Amino acid sequence: MDTIFAVSSGLLPSGVAVIRLSGPHVVHIVKTLCGCLPKARFMHYGNLIARDGSFLDSALTVFFPAPHSFTGEDCAEFHLHGGKAVVNRFLDELSTFSGCRIAEAGEFSRRAFMEGKLDLVQAEGLADLIEAETESQRRLAVMGTSGHLTTLYRDWRHKLMKVRAFIEAELDFADEEDIPDTISDKIWKDVEDLCTSLREHIREGERASILRDGLKIVIAGAPNSGKSSIMNRLAGRSVAIVTEEAGTTRDALEMRLVLGGLPIFLTDTAGFRKTENKIEQLGIEVAKQHVREADLVILVYDIVNPKQVDLPETSAEIWRVGNKLDLYEKNDPCWSIQFSALTGLNFDCFIKKLESFCHRRASEVGNLVPARKRQLQLLKEAVKEIENSLNYHSLDLSLRAEHLRRASDFLGKITGDIDVEDLLDIIFSEFCVGK
C-alpha cells in the first residue's frame, strides 16, 4: 500500500501549513527528513533536510505510530511555514520517495474506516463538521462524530438479531422439551416497540433537515406592499428592485442568511394579484409554489391600504405583518407585528421575532438524529421490512424471520458493518484532500 500525503490545513499562504502523511513508509520518510524519529506524540522542532542535502524548512514534526493514529496506520504531521513556495518544495520532496503519493479526496478518512477507526456514520459526521457554517449544522454534525448514533443503530441491530435467534430456535428445536412453546409469540411485542422507536427516529431526522439544509422563509403579499424592501433590509444591502410601480418583481429572488444559528433561505416573490400579463402570471405561479414549500410565510400588507391576498394551501406557519408603519403609526392587533422596512421603525422587533422562530424550530430537534438522506433512506427500508414481518401473520415463520434479517442488514449498512463497498467512493469523495 502507498504512503499518502496532503496539505490538511487549508488554503495557502497561511501562518502555518500542516502536511499529513499516512502509510507504511512514514518512519523511513520522517527519519530521512528529520535525521531522527521523534518520540511518539511529542512535537519535535528541527530542520528538515532534503535527500540532496538542501535545506527545506525549520518545522515542528509529530509522529503517530500505528494503531494509535487517525488512520490506524503510521502517521506523521509536518508543521511548516505556510508560504506557497515552502509548501510546494516540501511536497515535491515527498513525491520523490518510492511508494509515496499525494492523497485523493477523503483518502485519510477512508483508511481510518478500513482500519476500524471510524464507522460510516462518524465519517459522514466528520465531513459535515468540516462543511458546517452555522452552529446548528455544527451541532448536527457532532451527533454523528460522537459515536452515540452508531451505538444506537448497533443496539437496534443486535435486538433484531436476538429476535431472529429466538425464532430460529423455535424453528430448529420445536420438538425439544427445553424450548418453550411458541417462544416467538412472546418477542413480537419487542419488535413492535423497536419499530415504533425507528419511526420516531425517522420523524426526528426529517425535522432535523432544517439544521442541515436550512429553513425556507417566503415573503409574499400584494404588489407594492413592501416585500422587496423587507428583503433588502434583512440582507443589509440592495438585492431587490424597489419602485412605486406594481408588479416589478416577476421572478422569485432567493438569498441565504443565518438567523438564530440556523441557515435561512429567504425568498422574495411576485405580488399576488389578478393580471393579464403572461410573464407576471408565471411569476405568481412560481410564488405560489414557493409558498407551498415554505416553513414560514411572511404575508406582507401595506397597512395604509391593505389588500386581500389569497394564499395557496400550505403547511407553513403564516405571519400577517403590517408594513409602512412610518405612514400609519397606530397599533393594530390584526397584524402579527408592524414595522417600516423603509425607515427601519420597529424592524429590530421583527428580526427578534424571526430569530425566536428559528430557535423554536431548532429546539424541536432531538439530541440523536440521522443527518444524512442515506441514513434516513436505510432506516425507512428497515422499518418497511419490520412492518412486513409484523403485519403478515399468515406468512411462514421463516419468511417473517427473513424480513427481520433484511431489516438488520439495512441497519448494518448505515454504520458500514454490512458491505457497502459500492458507496465508499461516493461518501469519501465529499471530503477535502487533506482529510
From Swiss-Prot:
Recorded GO MF terms: GTP binding; GTPase activity; metal ion binding
List of residues binding Mg(2+): S228, T249
Classification via Pfam families: MMR_HSR1, MnmE_helical, TrmE_N
CDD domains: trmE, TrmE_N
Cofactor note: Binds 1 potassium ion per subunit.
Domain of life: Bacteria
NCBIfam families assigned: mnmE_trmE_thdF, PRK05291.1-3, small_GTP
Family to which the UniProt record says this protein belongs: Belongs to the TRAFAC class TrmE-Era-EngA-EngB-Septin-like GTPase superfamily. TrmE GTPase family.
Protein name: tRNA modification GTPase MnmE
Organism field: Bartonella tribocorum (strain CIP 105476 / IBS 506)
